[in-house]
C-alpha cells in the first residue's frame, strides 16, 4: 500500500465531507447517532468476534492484563457505547448559535456564530470505545473525522467503522464524514499529522510517548495534554474534615487518571493535624509516600511509615499509580509558586475556609481547571456538565480543560446590515 497516497485520499474525502456535515441538520445528525446505536446492538456478536481476534493477538504478543482489559469489548462496554451515542444525541447542538449581537454606530449589527472546526484527526491507542466516543462528538459538532486507532485494535475499529458508515448512510449523510484509517502502518500517523491542507486539528488520546512524538513531528495544530501533575494545597485555614475528604478522593478514587492528585502540599501550621490522619489512611490503602524532610518529621512522629525521601524529580512526576509526593510549605505564596513551577497546568485545588485566599488561588494558579474545597477528580467533561468530552487540554489555545462539543467548534464574526457603507 502506498501510505502517502492512501492518506491523501482519506484526507481529500474528509475535507469534502466536512462541508456537507457542517450544514447537516440537528435531526439528521441525531438520526445517524441513533442508527449507529441500533447497529451496535444488532451486531454485538460480530463486534465481539472481531474484538476477540484482536485480544488473542494482543495476548500472543505478551501485552499485560491492563492492556488487554482496555482492548476488550465486553457486553458492558458495548452497552456503554450505545448509551453514549444516545446521550450525545440529547445534547444541545452548538452549530449555528449566534451570540454577542450588538448594534454599532454605523448601523450594522455585529455578532458571532458558532461553526465546526472542519476535519478532526483522532489518534489513539488500544481502546476501541474511543472510535465511537470520538465519532459521536465530532459528528454532533458538525466535523468530519479521521480516526487512527492502535494497531492492536484494528479489527475492532474496522468493524465499528462499518456500523458508523451504515448509520451515516441511513441518515442521508456522507459515509466519508467518519473514516477509520485501515492500516496499522505507523507511517499513516506521520502523514495524518502533517496534512495541513486536509486536517484542521489533531486530538491525540494516548500515552506520553505518543504525545511527545506528535509534539515533535506534527504540523497540524493539536488539542492535547502531556501530563496530569495535579496538586492539592491544604491551607492553614482549612477545615481538617474537608481536607481529609478532598485529599483521600483526589488520590485514591482512581490512580491511573490524568486528574488524580500526584503532589500534596500542606501549610506548615496545619501539617500535624492533617498529615497524621492522612498519612495513616494512605498507608492503609497501600499508597507509597515520597516526602520532604519536614513532612517526614511530622509523619514519623505520628508513627506513619515506611516513607521514601522525595527528590526534585518527584515534584515533576505523573505517577499514575499509588504513589504520592508530599511537601510542607510555608503558606499560600510558596504553594502557588511550587504549582506554577512544577505542575503541568492541568488541575489544581486548594482547601481553605479563607475566601480571599481561595480567590487568589483561582486567579494566580496557571492551570486549565482550578478548584476550591473539591477533589481534582472532578476535572471531567461529564462532571462539568459538558455531557461528554473528547479529552482534556492543558494548552491555552484553542480549548482549555475538558473538551466537549463547544471545544470542537470555533466562532466566526457575522455582520448584518441594511446597505451601509463605511465612511
UniProtKB/Swiss-Prot annotation:
Membership in a protein family: Belongs to the gamma-glutamyl phosphate reductase family.
Gene behind this protein: proA
Protein's recorded name: Gamma-glutamyl phosphate reductase
Gene3D superfamilies hit by this protein: Aldehyde Dehydrogenase, Chain A, domain 1, Aldehyde Dehydrogenase, Chain A, domain 2
Pathway of action: Amino-acid biosynthesis; L-proline biosynthesis; L-glutamate 5-semialdehyde from L-glutamate: step 2/2
EC class: oxidoreductase
InterPro entries membership: Ald_DH/histidinol_DH, Ald_DH_C, Ald_DH_N, Aldehyde_DH_dom, G-glutamylP_reductase_CS, Glu-5-SA_DH, GPR_dom
Parts of the chain that traverse the membrane: none
Location, primary (coarse class): cytoplasm
Keywords: Amino-acid biosynthesis, Cytoplasm, NADP, Oxidoreductase, Proline biosynthesis
Gene Ontology MF terms: glutamate-5-semialdehyde dehydrogenase activity; NADP binding
Lineage: Bacteria, Pseudomonadati, Pseudomonadota, Betaproteobacteria, Burkholderiales
Catalysed reaction, written as an equation: L-glutamate 5-semialdehyde + phosphate + NADP(+) = L-glutamyl 5-phosphate + NADPH + H(+)
Record bears the keyword Amino-acid biosynthesis: yes
Amino acid at each position: 500500500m502506498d501510505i502517502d497516497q492512501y492518506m491523501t485520499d482519506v484526507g481529500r474525502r474528509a475535507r469534502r465531507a466536512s462541508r456537507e456535515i457542517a450544514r447537516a441538520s440537528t435531526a439528521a445528525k441525531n438520526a445517524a447517532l441513533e442508527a449507529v446505536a441500533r447497529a451496535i446492538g444488532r451486531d454485538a456478536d460480530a463486534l465481539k468476534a472481531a474484538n476477540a481476534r484482536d485480544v488473542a493477538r494482543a495476548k500472543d504478543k505478551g501485552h499485560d492484563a491492563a492492556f488487554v482489559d482496555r482492548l476488550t469489548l465486553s457486553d458492558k462496554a458495548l452497552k456503554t457505547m450505545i448509551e453514549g451515542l444516545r446521550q450525545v444525541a440529547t445534547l444541545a447542538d452548538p452549530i449555528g448559535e449566534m451570540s454577542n449581537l450588538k448594534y454599532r454606530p454605523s448601523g450594522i449589527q455585529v455578532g458571532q456564530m458558532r461553526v465546526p472546526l472542519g476535519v478532526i484527526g483522532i489518534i489513539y491507542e488500544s481502546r476501541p470505545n474511543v472510535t465511537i466516543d470520538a465519532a459521536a462528538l465530532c459528528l454532533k459538532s458538525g466535523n468530519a473525522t479521521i480516526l487512527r486507532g492502535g494497531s492492536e485494535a484494528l479489527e475492532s475499529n474496522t468493524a465499528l467503522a462499518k456500523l458508523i458508515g451504515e448509520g451515516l448512510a441511513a441518515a442521508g449523510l456522507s459515509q466519508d464524514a467518519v473514516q477509520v484509517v485501515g492500516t496499522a502502518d505507523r507511517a499513516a500517523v506521520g502523514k495524518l499529522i502533517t496534512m495541513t491542507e486536509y486536517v484542521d486539528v489533531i486530538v491525540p488520546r494516548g500515552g506520553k510517548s505518543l504525545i511527545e512524538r506528535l509534539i515533535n513531528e506534527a504540523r497540524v495544530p493539536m488539542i492535547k495534554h502531556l501530563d496530569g501533575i495535579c496538586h492539592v494545597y491544604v491551607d492553614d485555614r482549612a477545615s481538617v474534615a474537608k481536607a481529609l475528604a478532598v485529599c483521600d478522593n483526589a488520590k485514591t478514587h482512581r490512580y491511573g487518571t490524568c486528574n488524580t492528585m500526584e503532589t500534596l502540599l500542606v501549610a506548615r501550621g496545619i501539617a500535624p493535624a492533617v498529615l497524621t490522619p492522612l498519612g495513616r489512611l494512605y498507608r492503609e490503602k497501600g499508597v507509597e509516600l515520597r516526602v520532604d524532610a519536614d513532612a517526614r518529621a511530622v509523619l514519623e512522629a505520628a508513627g506513619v511509615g515506611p516513607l521514601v525521601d522525595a527528590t526534585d524529580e518527584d515534584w515533576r512526576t505523573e505517577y499514575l499509580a499509588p504513589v504520592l509526593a508530599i511537601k510542607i510549605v510555608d503558606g499560600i505564596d510558596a504553594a502557588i509558586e511550587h504549582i506554577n513551577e512544577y505542575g503541568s497546568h492541568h488541575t489544581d485545588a486548594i482547601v481553605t475556609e479563607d475566601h480571599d485566599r481561595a480567590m487568589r488561588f483561582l486567579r494566580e494558579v496557571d492551570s486549565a481547571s482550578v478548584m476550591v474545597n473539591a477533589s481534582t477528580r472532578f476535572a471531567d467533561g461529564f462532571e462539568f456538565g459538558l455531557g461528554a468530552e473528547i479529552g482534556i487540554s492543558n494548552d491555552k489555545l484553542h480549548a482549555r480543560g475538558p473538551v466537549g462539543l463547544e471545544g470542537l467548534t470555533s466562532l466566526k464574526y457575522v455582520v448584518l446590515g441594511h446597505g451601509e457603507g463605511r465612511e
